[in-house]
Amino acid sequence: MALQPAAGARDLNPHQVETNRNITERLARVFRLWGYDEVSPPRVERMKTLMAGGAIASRDIVRLVADDPLGLRPEMTASIARAACTRLATRPRPMRLWASGTVFRSRAADEGGQCIEENLQSGVELFGVAAIEAEMELLSLLMASIASLKLGPSTQPRLLLGHTQLMELILSPYEGPKRDAVRWALVHFDRLAVETMELLPNERKTLLSLMECRGTPKDVLQQLRHLFGQQPVFEDLDRLCSLLSKTALEQDIALQLDPTFQPQFELYTGLVFQLVCNGRSAPVVLARGGRYDELVQRCGAPENQAFGAGFSLAIDPIRELLVEDESAKADTTDVLVAYSSNSNLETALDHQQQWHAKGHSAVLELQPIRSMDEAQALAQARGDLQLDWVDL
């Protein structure tokens, strides 16, 4: 029998599990306040669904051995979009859904072979809204969600914003392989690739300046207007960032616009965003999302409803940032029920049930204890529990 979990998998201790549950319940309360209904997408889906029309590479999906090509979900958006366009197709739009669950991603291990990453997520999806109002609601909801977590000031959260139309503007002068090469260099921030590429001097200068074009939305949009003139996407981003600026200031969240930012999965066809915080040793991504109209269209939605946007929060990194989550501790007193040889287990069980009836957590020592002092020492060793000593 193997005594180690599979590569990439991990065991969680009781406190970690309790903290995860507390975080997801806290987020769920916020989602419900905003009118979102809970759904539960399947963990196992057909590969065609999981790949989202080619937006997610098959190498990122944990495949199952089965007659049909099946896999474990690497994210939940594609599954929820499929359900929204099929079983939930008759529900009125806008349709607001939220879900919480485990996602699985496959990657190559350092020593070779497959490594499976298992992560807990909680997130929301908004279907049927074409205009920027969808993103305005979602990012306001993200801000409310982060506020509910009460992260410490040392985390220094930053909301990184991008837009696929900004990248299209940058790539518009290029075609074919050169376009792909420029895009790769920008996304991976590879200055050397840009400097050695066959480009006109002014093109190289523009691309290098765009690689440095990240910062406050107001400053970045001003630079982009200087390069590309007035564009509708600039007005949408201006409106969105104006809405977020007050809340971001109150919550000490830095807003950063990056025209070259593109997420890992190519699901998105509009606004994209990530919330990044300082971890204990390196920056960590706590949330990511964006607009994915093309995915909804592939799922069979009619043209007037083929709109979707959403985000997910990564529960495990959030848990690691909560150094001491007081709310994960029980509100009630923990009790150890112990009995002497003068009593018996049946009587001790009655005492335990009385504690439970009062809403208190109580655990039972199954063997008689020689003395009350020994029982008290046992209660302290198990976490300074209150002792209920049964001696008769």
From Swiss-Prot:
Asked if Amino-acid biosynthesis is a keyword of the record, the answer is yes
Which UniProt key words apply to this protein? Answer: Amino-acid biosynthesis, Cytoplasm, Histidine biosynthesis
Xref: Gene3D superfamilies = Bira Bifunctional Protein, Domain 2 (3.30.930.10)
Entry-linked PROSITE patterns: AA_TRNA_LIGASE_II
Taxonomy, superkingdom: Bacteria
Quote the record's miscellaneous comment: This function is generally fulfilled by the C-terminal part of HisG, which is missing in some bacteria such as this one.
Q: What does this protein do?
A: Required for the first step of histidine biosynthesis. May allow the feedback regulation of ATP phosphoribosyltransferase activity by histidine.
HAMAP family to which the protein is assigned, alphabetical: HisZ
- Family note: Belongs to the class-II aminoacyl-tRNA synthetase family. HisZ subfamily.
What protein does this entry describe? ATP phosphoribosyltransferase regulatory subunit
Q: Which organism is it from?
A: Synechococcus sp. (strain CC9902)
Its taxonomic placement starts with:
Bacteria, Bacillati, Cyanobacteriota, Cyanophyceae, Synechococcales
